[in-house]
Swiss-Prot record:
Keyword terms: Aminoacyl-tRNA synthetase, ATP-binding, Cytoplasm, Ligase, Nucleotide-binding, Protein biosynthesis
Reaction(s) this enzyme catalyzes, per UniProt: tRNA(Pro) + L-proline + ATP = L-prolyl-tRNA(Pro) + AMP + diphosphate
Family (UniProt): Belongs to the class-II aminoacyl-tRNA synthetase family. ProS type 2 subfamily.
Protein name: Proline--tRNA ligase
Species per Swiss-Prot/TrEMBL record: Bartonella quintana (strain Toulouse)
A GO cellular component annotation in the UniProt record: cytosol
A Pfam match: tRNA-synt_2b
UniProt-listed InterPro entries: aa-tRNA-synt_IIb, aa-tRNA-synth_II, aa-tRNA-synth_II/BPL/LPL, Anticodon-bd, Anticodon-bd_dom_sf, Pro-tRNA-ligase_IIa, Pro-tRNA-synth_IIa_bac-type, Pro-tRNA_synthetase
Role of this protein: Catalyzes the attachment of proline to tRNA(Pro) in a two-step reaction: proline is first activated by ATP to form Pro-AMP and then transferred to the acceptor end of tRNA(Pro).
Subcellular location: Cytoplasm
Length: 441
């Protein structure tokens, strides 16, 4: 993409309404625009990052055996009355009526609808286990939406729902998603720590939050530093091996880790002083095992091998892709802007033409641009007639992992400068060596 043809509405000043780093940088980098309180449009740069986050989530869900569906944003109130949650959910739920005066709602979550889908089609234990997931926009009418897309009223969610014959099978499905989440966050460049959590309005008996460390995190967290020595499972892991899954979950839950709400001073005192870490954290995922909480009132049953009907045991597993984008920025930025992990950067390279009216500079930039695209990369070429300082500031702000700087002095020596956005380290290479290096990747 050529920046002269791209829609990138940058802001020079920090917006007054932005209280945290991610909100400030997402507005300044032209990623989002607020339409009304807690509701945002995603502009081209932000949409590219959001799509890459969703791609990684999909890959890891499907690696773990989940099957994608798509459920509507608008749901019938009757399903929620059937589960008993319609009156319990409170003012966060946006309730609406159609022209026939039927009660509808804009879904804040999908346990009822997916249970209805399941009970309509699945009737035998032979069709279990089953895990269905979707990625869809949701709405919760937050009392005080703030922090940009970190706590917005409309947000994108990946929800997965598992169905099993009994508790043992359901626990394995829970472990499977637990491990899939560890891998997902690792692929996004994040070190997420699983912590026991309150089940909240979703309900159930077992729950873990996945927390990343960030100075501007919304909650205090307490954890053992040994978590940072653990290795995330490789992509070759066998998700059908119950023992392997259980062992990984045991390993990742054997050290103390708790949010402020679940913190236990007696247990914390057992952790050695050298291993204690008190910090701030951001929730990036939440998983629940809730057994028959929804299958019982909604009659989701299957015929077992014993010839009897069994209520299915369920779990739900949520990741917010839109929130994750902000969380990554909170965890990875500096005073100049965003520092994207390579896996979700909106573009792979930023090519800076310091002097567009210089024939040699322009020719070198075009060679690099076409060569990188041929190699399967997605470069952004800054071909605007702007001051070099402005171009450097733009590239630092939007956080592309690698900058390729083409100026008249260096190109006279047939060289360009490569800058690593994260480390700031620069090196000079010939145009040919740049292309040869990245063709080998």
């Amino acid at each position: 993409m050529r920046l002269s043809q791209y829609f990138l509405p940058l802001l020079k000043e920090n917006p007054k309404e932005a209280e945290i780093i991610s909100h400030r940088l997402m507005l300044r980098a032209g990623m989002i625009r607020q339409q009304t309180s807690g509701i945002y449009s995603w502009l081209p740069l932000g949409k590219k990052v959001l799509d890459k986050v969703c791609k990684i989530i999909r890959e890891e869900q499907e690696r773990a055996g989940a099957v994608e569906i798509l459920m509507p944003t608008v749901q019938s109130a009757d399903l929620w009355r059937e589960s008993g949650r319609y009156d319990d959910y409170g003012l966060e739920m946006l309730r609406i009526k159609d022209r026939q005066k039927r009660d509808l709602l804009y879904g804040p979550t999908n346990e009822e609808m997916v249970t209805d889908i399941f009970r309509s089609y699945v009737h035998s234990y032979k069709d279990l286990p089953l895990n269905l997931y979707h990625i869809q926009w949701k709405f919760r009418d937050e009392i005080r939406p703030r922090f940009g897309v970190m706590r917005s009223r409309e947000f994108l969610m990946k929800d997965a729902y598992s169905f099993d014959l009994d508790y043992e099978g359901s626990k394995t499905s829970y472990n499977r998603m637990f491990v899939a989440y560890l891998r997902t966050f690792s692929c996004l460049g994040l070190k997420a720590i699983p912590m026991r959590a309150d089940t909240g309005p979703i309900g159930g008996e077992l729950s873990h939050e996945f927390i990343i460390l960030a100075e501007t995190g919304e909650s205090a967290i307490f954890c053992d530093k040994k978590f940072f020595e653990l290795t995330v499972p490789h992509s070759s892991i066998d998700f059908s091996d119950k023992a392997v899954l259980a062992n990984i979950v045991k390993q990742w839950t054997s050290f103390y880790a708790a949010t402020e709400e679940m913190h236990n001073e007696e247990e914390w005192a057992k952790v050695s002083d050298n291993d204690r870490l008190s910090a701030r954290g951001i929730e990036v995922g939440h998983i629940f095992h809730f057994g028959t909480k929804y299958s019982a009132p909604m009659g989701a049953k299957v015929m077992g091998q014993d010839g009897k009907e069994h209520l299915v045991s369920m779990g739900s597993y949520g990741i917010g892709p839109s929130r994750l984008v902000a969380a990554v920025i909170e965890a990875s930025h500096d005073e100049n802007g965003i520092i994207w992990p390579k896996s979700i950067a909106p573009f792979d390279f930023g090519i800076i033409n310091m002097k567009p009216n210089d024939e040699k500079c322009t020719r070198a930039c075009e060679t690099l641009y076409s060569g990188l695209m041929q190699a399967g990369f997605d470069p952004l070429l800054d071909d605007r007639n702007e001051r070099p300082g402005s171009k450097f500031a733009t590239m630092d702000l939007i956080g592309l992992p690698t900058q390729i700087i083409v100026g008249p002095k260096s190109i006279a020596q047939n060289e360009v400068e490569i800058k690593d956005r994260k480390t700031g380290v620069k090196k000079s290479l010939t145009v040919e060596n740049v292309l040869n290096q990245f063709f080998r990747i």
